[in-house]
Amino acid sequence: MADMDSHKRIAVMDLGTNVFNLLIADFLPDKYSFVKEFKCAARLGAGGGIKTGRILPVAFGSAKEALSKIMQVINETGEVSLIHPYATSAVRDADNSAEFVTAVNGEFGISIDVIPGEREAELIFKGIKASGVFCNLKNGENALLMDIGGGSNEFVITDGHSVLYKRSFPLGMARMREKFNYSEPIGKEVAEEFAGYCYSQLNELWQMTERYKPVILVGSSGSFDTFKDYIYNCGLKEKPYVELPLDELMAMNNVMVKSVAAERMRMPGMSPVRVDFIVLSSLFTQLVIKQVNPKAVYQSGYSLKEGAVAELYEKWRETGCVADNLL
């Protein structure tokens, strides 16, 4: 273990397509702990930006407003010596991503780390691993990890210790909602067309699941948080992971596909930022379950930002430093 300060407080941001997430953590020589978590809507694809491949002015404004709120939380928490923002699909795929990164740096003084999809999948794996959910794997068994995002969906196959396969697919729900424009409730033909399209785009994943035969499916954060809140009526908040009974997931899907936005907003734990996308998320999850046939499905409350904290903590323990963009 390298020489280090006895304490360091860091802030990690996950700048997603629909939501910006903040996690503040304290590093001590023998452990780390979470101090503060905050999230707010950002809608980087607003105004048709996903379809045009650009972060449009309305999205710039929304993102800056979200970052202002996040920076206020960081300042109010105090003692943060490092801020590490990770940007994912909406920023990395935008033609004007460099312009966005420069604008954020100029206004807030933070340097955004725009990460590729495979790196995103790696951090998601580390976050899910930190949740402890892999204790449900027996020796020789594998798990399929899935993170449903706004711009992309990440998949990882793991034995609980190492990554056997990882891939990011540009099939995020904000992207799919633009592609499959429909009036509510979603019609059977549109639902089948959506499932068929996703199935064809995931051919490589199906080959890998046939090869590694994962026995459990773990969905992280985002849509799976909403699934958990629906099934458990917003209970079990303190648990880093929970099992989502397959029969209840199926029943929930049947409710979702028949619902309209006003009905979904009355459902337990429904976030306004997810109300337009949760139907497709549910259909996508059912497609994966049908194809993979896991014996159990779990929700992990830990994902990219928790994985980033775990990784930065290990670096701090080994080297005594975390990163270059210190405040």
Locate each region found by the language model.
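Hydrophobic residues embedded in beta-strands of well-ordered beta-sheets
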Residues: 20, 32, 153, 163-164
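Helical "lid/coupling" subdomains associated with nucleotide-phosphate turnover
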Residues: 7-10, 24-27, 45-80, 90-142, ...
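Ser/Thr-glycine-rich phosphate-binding loops at phosphate-binding pockets of nucleotides
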Residues: 17-19, 128, 149-155, 222
